[in-house]
UniProtKB/Swiss-Prot annotation:
Binding site for GTP: Q11, E82, S151, G155, T156, T190, N217, N239
GO cellular component, one term: microtubule
Subcellular location: Cytoplasm, Cytoskeleton
Gene behind the chain: alphaTub67C
Residues annotated to bind Mg(2+): E82
Descriptive protein name: Tubulin alpha-4 chain
Amino acid sequence: MREVVSIQIGQCGIQIGNACWELYLLEHGINLDGSLKTKEELTASGSSASVGHDTSANDARTFFTETGNGKQVPRSIFVDLEPTVIDDVRNGCMRELYHPEQLISGKEDAANNYARGRYSIGKEVIDRVTSRLQKIAEQCDSLQGFLIFHSLGGGTGSGFTSLLVERLSTDYSKKCKLDFAVYPSPKVSTAVVEPYNALLTTHSTMDHSDCVFMVDNEAIYDICNNSLGVDRPAYRNLNRLIAQIVSSTTASLRFSGSMNVDLNEFQTNLVPFPRIHFPLVAYAPLMSAERSAHEQHAITTLTNACFESSNMMVKCDPRAGKFMACCMLYRGDVVPKDVNAAVSAIKSKRHIQFVDWCPTGFKIGINYEKPAFVPDGDLAKTSRACCMLSNTTAISVAFSNLSYKFDLMFKKRAFVHWYVGEGMEEGEFTEARENIAVLERDFEEVGLDNAEEGGDEDFDEF
């Protein structure tokens, strides 16, 4: 079995993780206490897992460990430096599902400070986390890698994540590390120092993370408002939407399908150069139940929708950049012939530009397991869905927005004393800023055509 370990860090990571496990339970036909649903229960709930129940339980083993009495336990760790959010999980509706030793909390908050999460408070918790991870890894037959959920704006999500990811790359250097990171958005902000935290984390994990799927709160808010008709979205709405995207991305790891995508394949197909590892995620259909009743979810429609900026998880315009790679993950009632036709149509469109050194650029994944939906959720229940993971130069706008805000504060050395007071050196700020400036230049250069670079001259002799 090719197992995957999920690590949820900080308030944001834990709440997204909780929403993901809620969805996985529905998809695999598992009760809140970890027991498998009976065939009668599955039929009554209309779950897609009712078809081939034994297969579904087998498929779940990538993400779940099975105990002696048949109970399914998430192969997952929840970490926070203060107890409040973890206590909510301990007392929540899924309290019987998680292994109590895999819910790890400290005593003191990171207070939105990267340096506290990484250097002072984080150091007290890191050994507990790594020893628990070691225990989980030892129980795996063939560990594929890690999925890490966190925000880049909070103290724990930024600082502790960078500390842990460094440890992981030392202890599990050959294993894949995929991040789902919530980026500070241009308008929606929860802390003044978010640009500092986000830039410092991006810098410190640059050489350790293999692939970072970025999500931006503002983009998710807008989807809830405009596409799903939720007037005042709460975090619960946002997290459930993110969970649906994570579920589509990981469906091929959890279910057997005709054209499945392995954890390492994401990296191989999406990351042309080690530093350019920030794919953009899009999902379709994004609509409420009322609208869905009047829509036809044809494969072509879903594929085209994934290239619209309103379906992207980061505020950016895909038409302003060039695509280096594109991974289309279809699930549900999907026929390969229709997929090929839809992708061919996309390739012929003028406004979707690929870099000239990567002319084909499409990786297709098809999974016949229909998407599951949380009861009373915002998304319409549909028989098929499409998730697009693309590496595009358009995402560099997220870094330039962040750099601009970072510069405004750092010019005045605002709030820097809080970081230095926790054992961090001021030079790390400058180092991080320079690294991100180089990253922005990398994106620019990657988007240049060979002709523009004058690269063809080198090959004249051939």
